[in-house]
Regions:
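Acidic, Gly/Pro-rich loop/turn segments at junctions of secondary structure
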Residues: 129-195
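Hydrophobic hinge/microswitch elements
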Residues: 129-134, 139-142, 149, 205-267
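A late-sequence structural motif
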Residues: 266-305
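Short amphipathic alpha-helical coupling segments at ligand-binding clamshell hinges
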Residues: 60, 64-67, 105, 109, ...
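N-terminal helix-turn-helix
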Residues: 1-70
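Short beta-strand->loop
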Residues: 162-170, 260-275
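Central regulatory/effector-binding core of bacterial HTH transcription factors
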Residues: 90-155
Length: 305
């Protein structure tokens, strides 16, 4: 059954005349008649009484008319709803981001980008999750951009031919812990075989966990750690460090306010234990929506943040 048949049927029902209905539908009368007959065959009953000059609906036609009207109305409304949805989706830029950057970096970065732009983004969607989940989101095409930390010793699933990236800024993972009564680190590095340092560790799905683990493998001497708590959320590790439960490698941007005198945290060692990292924005190499492409071009020519 073709929806054109329904439109033809309703035109004949309205005009009560095949010739005038055909003129209104901009088709020949024989073509209109064939399509109405095809609809009647599909329904299984005559819809019009053709015995008189003025065409009238049969009882079956009277029953079928509101069905045809409702069907076409629903189809047209559904089409308009989908078109509106597609239009909105095309104008929306979706970001995936690790939890730490979603909280500490994304809002100010986006504001700085938009302040320097002639047209701010009209639709923004942010999905905050673990690095592992964010990579999956990108690989499945559910986001256009991924904001994450990066280190060459810990390449991720997006490092390669299908994605490209921009470096937006830099940060440092610093080992921090609560101070003791004298202000010295309560859990100092590097520890030793008989006295490992209580370690507040990132879980396996965390991007910063991958980075920290890879970077520690190159440190001399290698820290002697005993994991006492695990989470993929840097803010939670910070809370546990403030509570004195161990040492955590945390972004300097996250803990800098806590490293001032009396702030609750101190460095657990000198600068040799620091891990420099970059902040990257990944995107697929395949072409994105026009709005997303314009945003990317703006970033390529703009400053870092």
């Amino acid at each position: 059954m073709d929806t054109i048949w329904l439109e033809d049927f309703l035109a004949v029902a309205e005009w009560a005349n095949f010739s005038r209905a055909a003129e209104h539908r901009n088709v020949t009368q024989p073509a209109l008649s064939r399509r109405v007959k095809a609809l009647e065959d599909w329904v299984g009953a005559p819809l019009f009484d053709r015995a008189t000059h003025r065409i009238t609906l049969t009882e079956a036609g009277e029953r079928f008319r509101p069905v045809a009207e409702d069907t076409l109305r629903r189809l047209h409304q559904g089409r308009e709803d989908i078109r509106a949805l597609v239009s909105t989706a095309a104008a929306t830029v979706t970001f995936a981001s690790t939890h730490a950057l979603a909280l500490t970096y994304f809002p100010a970065w986006l504001r700085a980008v938009e302040d320097a732009a002639p047209e701010p983004l009209s639709g923004i969607r942010l999905v905050a999750d673990t690095m592992q989940a964010c990579e999956r989101i990108m690989l499945q095409g559910q986001a256009q951009f991924l904001l994450c930390h990066h280190h060459p010793a810990a390449p991720g699933r997006l490092d390669g031919g299908d994605f490209r990236s921009l470096t937006l800024g830099a940060d440092t993972l610093v080992p921090v812990c609560a101070p003791d009564g004298a202000g010295a680190p309560r859990h100092p590095l590097p520890g030793g075989p008989g006295q490992p340092v209580a370690h507040l560790s990132y879980s396996d799905e965390s991007g910063m966990g991958r980075i920290a683990e890879a970077a520690r493998g190159t440190m001399e001497p290698r820290p002697c750690l005993e994991t006492v708590f695990t989470s993929h959320v840097a803010v939670l590790l910070k809370t546990m460090a403030l509570d004195g439960r161990g040492l955590a490698w945390l972004p300097l941007s996250l803990v800098q306010p806590d490293l001032v005198p009396g702030g609750g945290l101190v460095r657990a060692g000198d600068g040799r234990w620091d891990i420099p990292i970059t902040i990257r924005l990944f995107r697929p190499r395949a072409r994105l929506s026009p709005v997303a492409e314009r945003f990317w071009e703006r970033l390529k020519t703009g400053p870092t943040y």
